[in-house]
Amino acid sequence: MTDFIPLAMDAPIWNRFFTIAPLIVVGTKEDDSYDLAPKHMATPIGPSNYFGFVCTPKHSTYRNITKTGEFAVSFPMPDQTVLAALSASPRCENGSGAKKIVDVLPTFKTNTIDALFIKNSYLYL
């Protein structure tokens, strides 16, 4: 039998050890423009076609999905890590709220919803 060490529950247990989770980029429609946001806590949910990722209501991604009911998911290739990171660039300070970085990242529109994918990713949902 193995001796177990109890984990203190006063802080998130996931900060105490390494787990593997995919890097994804979530694409949403935001008013008259598009938003891209990298996420790393993403996973299939059960054996059916359900998928989940963690996002706080403080983020535009959450608000966009709540408003439109739609989002696209790109699983970037390992050599696209910098592109994924750039999609988290801050919004313009001119009050427009636009993320100009989205205009220069290699993207394409999805076939079925109004959102963007990252080109050359290995999986699109």
Task: Please tell me what each predicted stretch does.
Residues 39-41:
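Short Gly/aromatic-enriched secondary-structure transition segments
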